[in-house]
Amino acid sequence: MNRRTFLTASSVAAAYSATGVSTASGAGNDPSRFGLDLWSVRSQGWNAFQYVDHAVEHSLKVIQFADANTLGGLHPEHARKVKAYADERGVLVEMGMGTICPTASGWNASKGPIEPWILRHVEAARLLGSPVLRCLMGSAKERKTELPLEKHTEAMLKTLRNLRSQVTDMGVVMAIENHSGDYQGRELAPIIEEAGKDWVGVVYDSGNPIWTIEDPMVALEHLAPYIVSSHLRDSYVWATEEGVAARWVVFGEGNVGMKDVLRVLLERCPNASILLETITVRHNDLKVKRSDFWKGYENVPANEFMRFYALAEKGNPQPPLPKLTKEEMAVRQLTDSNQGIVNVRKMFAA
């Protein structure tokens, strides 16, 4: 890849082709970049090569390593071996990491300055042939900290500015996820514009909007111009006495309009990877009828909130989630992920 190549959403497909792996359609009616966010099956005890084998077993074209732990470390030679193994089997690889914000609760300051840590992941992405590095700011915690959300955003943007030249030299797009309650779509979109949409994009996660009292479609409408990869997740929401109960479910078993989300995602973001992510043991009570809930959400537009609440009004109360042992969790993850693959393929074929 040429020095200082800027990757935008429209050029991600070309970057994949440059790896030498065909971007032709995969199994059946799959989009050519349908695959798996490996966080879905993180408890299996697999190494990077076994994750590739899992993709081959299910005729998946793309996998995304969530972080260095999932990959098995950031040693350059290891990344080269994983790329070679994946290339031989026709599997495309994307790389991920955690926070890129030095003030976020997810950053461990004992690691030292955050910039070198980020650059190690960028280098791993380059060696893996990943055109994107999935990253994030934080979580819902950053809405409630003494430091306002806007200050966390400023710290992240400063970090990005410091790294722009080095990252673009390596030809990697920094792809910020709307993650675990940190940003609504309307908040993340202007951040991409300010950072520079020629080298910073979005990993759209369709499950995380419910953690920010947002309809997944609303988030998609805001973020579509910037999406370079995606986590396809389903959710179920229902109204409660104090607000809304929300949980992630097996894809196809939710009530938040994923058929329409998938249709719009494919239409408006044709070059983005569609990566199934399955998490089914998380529950959140969003007590939106209590005034103290709204700290950190003061600027949410009423019309957008009501689109979210309308989804909850159509839901029915669900039974409590089971408490699982470590072994049961591993089985549950694999079973639910595999069922999600079956379900999303039915939707592709519809």
Indicate where each model-derived feature is located.
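Hydrophobic faces of well-ordered beta-strands that scaffold small-molecule active sites
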Residues: S32-L38, I63-F65, V93-M97, L133-C135, ...
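Active-site acidic/histidine proton-transfer and metal-coordination neighborhood
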Residues: Y85-L92, A104-G201
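Histidine-acidic metal/acid-base catalytic patches
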Residues: R4-Y16, A27-R33, F49-Q50, V56, ...
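Acidic (Asp/Glu)-rich catalytic clusters
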Residues: G28-N29, V52-E57, L74-M95, L119-G129, ...
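Glycine-rich, proline-tolerant flexible connector loops at the mouths of alpha/beta enzymes
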Residues: Q64-K83, A140-K144, P148
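C-terminal segment of N-terminal export signals and the immediately downstream linker at the start
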Residues: G20-W46
